């Protein structure tokens, strides 16, 4: 069975892992890093992904970051005359992770387990599956990030324990409470905030820098796109620095200019000031944490371990806040950047049978239901219900002789339908005429192991049935997804072709250089006619490079390579002959020296005879 990879598709960074020899292993990217920035850039028709895209973000306005924050919405990115959905941008990131995994494993990868924030709604989960499909991946399972982290943390743990997974990533926050032991993982409750993460901590530092610079220079940097990108990079670096030191220097020379000349930003940021700036953000993580404890029917003292996930949990104020709330020192035995991908790989191992005796019971993060008379939200499945699950309820008509009913499917916790998230609508028609309240309409909700919702409505009188699989609210049809899959494949092919062209040019340039050196080294050791032939072939290759015709470059390169190889062979042969001649000459002269040697007679003198 081919490998199923585990992917943590993050807001800021992504990570891919696989089961090898019974253990989950992170797959490094070609740059040697274990995580890849979730950044995509477009430049002169070329797509850049990861570290290379992040490095040029300051100078390239066509750079997309933190796209995960827009998953499941109708948000679009307009670049070079084309609109991209969040699914398409995410698919470009997934394509890179897929290619890196294939290079590492030496085999084609077609299946994946992808993680999502536990608090993602159905639209966001469906959008993630669509992104996988566009990238050429069959998404076998969607796993909640805190659950994946718990899988990686608890796989070898045999003792029963209750853990709290506190997951503060680049753009989302989740908290889950699980009971685990001896291969059994049960999520008791989950909560979170999909609009809170490390990006927001960067933002408060940026706002502070903008305010301080304006106070000092009277210039508002927030209107300058390039300056703001430099500020974002500096803010992110300062945030990371302050996890290890108590103050850091932010220095951005030539950040802008006015009539008096260039302006530089120089500022010292202390950890205390950063804590003050981000205090509200830290506090916002504690509300969902308390709610999860309450939903699980537990107090802080019932928690055995606190597992921190996500790069933002390295912030000292965050660690201090969770320690204060739970009374526990956070567990430091997992890498917060990698543990989710490792857990996804474990889940992939469960699906392939590589990992045995693991039972995972997850929950739905939000309540599900329909709109009933008066715009009320009637819940059929309460939040934190173990999935997969199915629930039915019978409803009736609101008016006499009503021929159809609209089923408005919603997800959320508010009392009124208008305040919750619409997942979809469908209609059950051809209801026989009857007084209101008489027809029996059974509505059934099914949630699968991915947290994806199916809803059906059935008229119990006629057995007529209508169903809907909720698709993402971004409204991507199957046709649109298939078209995007084809575009993604075409782009991957184009990227491969472009790389091959670049490599061909580099090889041709190198050959021109080495030819010039070889001709110089040959000097008068070969016929002028042969040298002229090589010169002509070299000039032909140079012209082909200038014309930038791939076929001509390849043909001219092959022709020159053949001539240079023959010349080089001749040079080596001459060098070998010269060396042999020198060795023979050395042996001859040694023989002559032997002929001139005279054997001397000697006589032993006895000192006693001299006396």
From Swiss-Prot:
CDD domains hit by this protein: ASKHA_NBD_HSP70_DnaK-like
GO molecular function: ATP binding; ATP-dependent protein folding chaperone; unfolded protein binding
Pfam (any one): HSP70
InterPro entries documented for this protein: ATPase_NBD, Chaperone_DnaK, Heat_shock_70_CS, HSP70_C_sf, HSP70_peptide-bd_sf, Hsp_70_fam
Coiled-coil stretches: none
Protein name as it appears in the record: Chaperone protein DnaK
Region Disordered: start-end pairs: 575-611
This protein's encoding gene: dnaK
Biased composition (Acidic residues): 596-611
Similarity comment: family membership: Belongs to the heat shock protein 70 family.
Inducers of expression: By stress conditions e.g. heat shock.
Organism placement in taxonomy: Bacteria, Bacillati, Bacillota, Bacilli, Bacillales
PROSITE patterns xref list: HSP70_1, HSP70_2, HSP70_3
Organism per entry: Shouchella clausii (strain KSM-K16) (Alkalihalobacillus clausii)
Residues making up the signal peptide according to the UniProt record: none
């Amino acid at each position: 069975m081919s490998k199923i990879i585990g992917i943590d598709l993050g807001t800021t960074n992504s990570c891919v892992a696989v089961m090898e020899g019974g253990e989950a292993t992170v797959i490094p990217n070609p740059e040697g890093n274990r995580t890849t920035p979730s950044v995509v850039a477009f430049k002169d028709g070329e797509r850049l992904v990861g570290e290379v895209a992040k490095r040029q973000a300051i100078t390239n306005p066509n750079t997309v970051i933190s796209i995960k924050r827009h998953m499941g919405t109708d948000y679009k990115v307009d670049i070079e005359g084309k609109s991209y959905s969040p699914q398409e941008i995410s698919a470009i990131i997934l394509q890179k992770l897929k290619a890196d995994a294939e290079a590492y494993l030496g085999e084609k990868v077609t299946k994946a387990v992808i993680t999502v924030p536990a608090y993602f709604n159905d639209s966001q989960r469906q959008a993630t599956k669509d992104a996988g499909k566009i990238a050429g991946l069959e998404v076998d399972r969607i796993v909640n990030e805190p659950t994946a982290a718990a899988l990686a943390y608890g796989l070898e743990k045999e003792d029963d324990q209750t853990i709290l997974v506190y997951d503060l990533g680049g753009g989302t926050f989740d908290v889950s409470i699980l009971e685990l032991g001896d291969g059994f993982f049960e999520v008791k409750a989950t909560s979170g905030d999909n609009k809170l993460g490390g990006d927001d901590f960067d933002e408060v530092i940026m706002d502070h820098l903008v305010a301080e610079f304006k106070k000092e220079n009277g210039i508002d940097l927030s209107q300058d796109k390039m300056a703001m990108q430099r500020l974002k990079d500096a803010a992110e670096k300062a945030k990371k620095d302050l996890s290890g030191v108590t103050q850091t220097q932010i220095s951005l020379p030539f950040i802008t200019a006015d009539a008096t000349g260039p302006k530089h930003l120089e500022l010292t940021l202390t950890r205390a000031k950063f804590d003050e700036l981000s205090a509200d953000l830290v506090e916002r993580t504690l509300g969902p944490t308390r709610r999860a404890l309450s939903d699980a029917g537990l107090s802080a003292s019932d928690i055995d371990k606190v597992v921190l996930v996500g790069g933002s949990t390295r912030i000292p104020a965050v660690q201090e806040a969770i320690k204060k709330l739970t009374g526990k020192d956070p567990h430091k035995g997992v890498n917060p950047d990698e543990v989710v991908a490792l857990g996804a790989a474990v889940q992939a191992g469960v699906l392939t049978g590589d990992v045995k005796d693991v039972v995972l019971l997850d929950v739905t993060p939000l309540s599900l239901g329909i709109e009933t008379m008066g715009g009320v939200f009637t819940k059929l499945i309460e939040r934190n219900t173990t999935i997969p699950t199915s629930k039915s309820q019978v409803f009736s008509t609101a008016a006499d002789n009503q021929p159809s009913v609209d089923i408005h499917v919603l997800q959320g916790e508010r009392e009124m339908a208008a305040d919750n998230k619409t997942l979809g609508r469908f209609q059950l028609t051809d209801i026989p005429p009857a007084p209101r309240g008489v027809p029996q309409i059974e509505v059934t909700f099914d949630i699968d192991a991915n947290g994806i919702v199916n809803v059906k409505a059935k008229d119990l009188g006629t057995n007529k049935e209508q169903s809907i699989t909720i698709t993402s609210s971004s409204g991507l049809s199957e046709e649109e997804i298939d078209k995007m899959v084809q575009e993604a494949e075409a782009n991957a092919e184009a990227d491969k072709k472009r790389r091959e062209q670049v490599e061909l040019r580099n090889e041709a340039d190198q050959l021109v250089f080495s030819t010039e050196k070889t001709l110089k080294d040959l000097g008068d050791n070969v016929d002028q006619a042969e040298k002229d032939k090589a010169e002509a072939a070299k000039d032909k290759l140079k012209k082909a490079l200038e014309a930038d015709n791939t076929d001509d470059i390849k043909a001219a390169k092959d022709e020159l390579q053949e001539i240079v190889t023959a010349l080089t062979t001749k040079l080596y042969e001459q060098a070998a002959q010269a060396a042999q001649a020198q060795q023979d000459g050395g042996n001859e002269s040694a023989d002559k020296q032997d002929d001139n040697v005279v054997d001397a007679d000697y006589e032993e003198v006895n000192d006693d005879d001299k006396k």
